[in-house]
C-alpha cells in the first residue's frame, strides 16, 4: 500500500486530544512510504484468535523515502499519490480523496496515543491494494515528495 507519511514536530511532545483545526501545526514533515502487510501471518493469527499485528510489524514492513519539511512542501493535501508494481499501475489517486484527511488522522490517533516529536504516521491508501511476491518491484510516489522504489527479495 502506498502512503504519505507524516512526521511529528516538537509541538507534538506528549500531546493528546489534538483538535482537527490544530492538527497540522503538529506536523514537522512528510515522506513517501509503503505500508506492507504479510497476509499469510495476518490470516494465521486471525484464525487462531490472536492479535494480528505480526502481519503488519515485520522486518522491512514500512520502507520510507526522504523526509521533507512541511514548510517546504506546497499542496500536499491534494497531491497525487500512486503505486506501480512491475511497471503496471496498481494505485492512483490524490490525497484529498482519501477517507480521512491528514488533520483528521492526527486528531483521531491523539485520542488513543501520546504523539511525540519524530513519530511516523502512515496515512491511508487509495484503492488497488494487492499482493506482491519475491522479485516484484514497487515504485510509488506522492507529488512533491518524490518516489520510493522497493524490490521484494
What are the residue ranges of the model-derived segments?
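Short, flexible, glycine/charge-rich loop motifs used to bind or transfer phosphoryl groups or to couple energy/partner
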Residues: 1-2, 20-21, 111, 128
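Extended, compositionally biased flexible segments
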Residues: 10, 14-31, 40-43
Amino acid at each position: 500500500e502506498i502512503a504519505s507519511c507524516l512526521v511529528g514536530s516538537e509541538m507534538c511532545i506528549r500531546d493528546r486530544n489534538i483538535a482537527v483545526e490544530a492538527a497540522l501545526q503538529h506536523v514537522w514533515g512528510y515522506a513517501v512510504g509503503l505500508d506492507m502487510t504479510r497476509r499469510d501471518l495476518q490470516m494465521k493469527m486471525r484464525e487462531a484468535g490472536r492479535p494480528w499485528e505480526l502481519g503488519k510489524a515485520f522486518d522491512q514492513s514500512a520502507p520510507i523515502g526522504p523526509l521533507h519539511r512541511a514548510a517546504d512542501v506546497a499542496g500536499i493535501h491534494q497531491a497525487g499519490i500512486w503505486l506501480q508494481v512491475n511497471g503496471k499501475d496498481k494505485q492512483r489517486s490524490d490525497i484529498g480523496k482519501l477517507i480521512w484527511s491528514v488533520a483528521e488522522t492526527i486528531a483521531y490517533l491523539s485520542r488513543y496515543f501520546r504523539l511525540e516529536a519524530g513519530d511516523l504516521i502512515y496515512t491511508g491508501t487509495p484503492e488497488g491494494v494487492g499482493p506482491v511476491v519475491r522479485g516484484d518491484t514497487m515504485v510509488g510516489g506522492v507529488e512533491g515528495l518524490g518516489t520510493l522504489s522497493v524490490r521484494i527479495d
